[in-house]
């Protein structure tokens, strides 16, 4: 689980990125940045990050989440988070970022909250 694997799938007009691995400085954050950039270039503006398989995220990974959120919002889109692990939820709470991101425990709830 050293690298970050990202698989994309569609649910209506929402792109879901199922992530497995670590979002860390270097490969993980670069993979996330590249995936988000490609989606925006394709005109996809509703993005749901499924973080159930993310075992670890460092400060660079947190920065990449914030950067992705900012880029998507600036482009008129929405970024939401799905299936936060307890560790990630605690980290986002401590950094006060849990108030910035919309996060959901199940996919159906997340999908129904896209506008």
What are these regions (language model features)?
Residues 23-101:
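Amphipathic alpha-helical interaction surfaces in cytosolic regulatory modules
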Residues 102-106:
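Short acidic-hydrophobic, aromatic-tinged amphipathic segments that line or gate anion-handling sites
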Residues 114-115:
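A short, charged, amphipathic alpha-helix used as a generic interaction element across diverse proteins
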């Amino acid at each position: 689980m050293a690298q970050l694997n990202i698989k994309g799938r569609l649910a209506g007009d929402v792109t879901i990125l199922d992530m497995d691995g670590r979002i860390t400085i270097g490969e993980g954050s670069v993979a996330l940045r590249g995936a988000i950039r490609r989606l925006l270039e394709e005109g996809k503006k509703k993005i749901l990050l499924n973080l159930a398989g993310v075992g670890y995220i460092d400060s660079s990974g947190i920065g990449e989440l914030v950067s992705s959120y900012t880029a998507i919002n600036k482009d008129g889109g929405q970024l939401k988070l799905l299936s936060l692990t307890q560790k990630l939820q605690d980290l986002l709470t401590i950094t006060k970022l849990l108030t910035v991101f919309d996060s959901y425990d199940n996919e159906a709830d997340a999908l129904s909250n896209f506008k």
